[in-house]
């Protein structure tokens, strides 16, 4: 398995010194080392060797799972990964920020398959921490250049026609840890501020039309989140009228996770993740 933590101080120092000799030389040495490793025969390159006399105990001795009863149905009301996969987690970069409430956690890309990021491993980016908001008390408000200022509850939003779409979201700072130099061991820390999910929600244009928004004179929508930072971003009306922007409540077949905006967030394809305003 790929290492899950940063290089130690000596490793970082060595990488830094090698990088100073020039990027081309650094890459040339890396390829040379890789070629040498490929040319060197190793015992495991052709599969496991035939076990010594007596056989493989993992085959000959029946394990407990082959002889006894396992766990019953609904032992876990909400399924979770195997304990043998416990090393696959979101991780934060030590010292990146002074507080974890205004920081980022990285998705373990090197350990994932396909294009969908499990909701529990989706990268995080917060500006004032995350909250588990009571959906029964949450409100979605529309005002400004509209005929009817509108307030919607979660129940009202979820009764409207919805769509489900796969979208990538990426933080604008993705890969920033290597802008200065190579200093981390896996793509989790270099590219882990990107994730892909199937999002479910109502097109924002539907809600604006309900409120009688002036779609011709209005050029932008100012989206504001309900967290302590009052995160705001402008969204071009051209994106909204295309039907691409969603007011989403679902992620990968279930409700959004609190770390990713539960119970409601914007999905704004094609722009930096900071515009996907949460809460």
Describe every region a protein language model picked out.
Residues 11, 34, 38-43, 61, ...:
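Glycine-centered secondary-structure boundary/capping sites
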Residues 17, 34-36, 63, 93:
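Compositionally biased, low-complexity segments enriched in small residues
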Residues 23-48:
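N-terminal export signals
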């Amino acid at each position: 398995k790929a290492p899950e933590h940063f290089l130690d101080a000596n490793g970082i120092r060595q990488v830094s010194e090698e990088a100073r000799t020039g990027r081309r030389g650094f890459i040339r040495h890396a390829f040379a080392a890789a070629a040498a490793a490929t040319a060197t025969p190793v015992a495991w390159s052709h599969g496991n060797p035939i076990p010594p006399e007596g056989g493989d105990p993992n085959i000959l001795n029946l394990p407990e799972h082959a002889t006894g009863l396992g766990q019953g149905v609904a032992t876990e009301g909400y399924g979770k990964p195997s304990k043998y996969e416990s090393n696959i987690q979101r991780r934060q970069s030590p010292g990146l920020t002074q507080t974890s409430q205004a920081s980022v956690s990285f998705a373990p890309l090197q350990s994932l398959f396909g294009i969908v990021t499990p909701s529990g491993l989706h990268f995080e980016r917060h500006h004032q921490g995350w909250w588990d908001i009571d959906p029964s008390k949450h409100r979605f408000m529309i005002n400004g250049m509209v005929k009817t200022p509108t307030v919607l509850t979660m129940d009202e939003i979820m009764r409207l026609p919805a769509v489900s779409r796969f979208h990538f979201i990426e933080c604008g700072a993705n890969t920033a840890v290597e802008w200065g130099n190579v200093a981390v061991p896996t793509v989790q820390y270099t590219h882990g501020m990107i994730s892909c999910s199937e999002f479910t929600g109502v097109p924002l244009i539907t809600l604006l039309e309900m409120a009688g928004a002036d779609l011709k004179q209005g050029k932008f929508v100012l989206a504001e989140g309900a967290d302590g930072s009052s995160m705001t971003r402008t969204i071009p009306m051209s994106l909204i009228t295309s039907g691409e922007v969603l007011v989403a409540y679902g992620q990968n077949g279930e409700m959004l996770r609190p770390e990713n905006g539960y119970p409601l967030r914007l999905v704004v394809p094609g722009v930096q993740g900071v515009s996907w305003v949460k809460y």
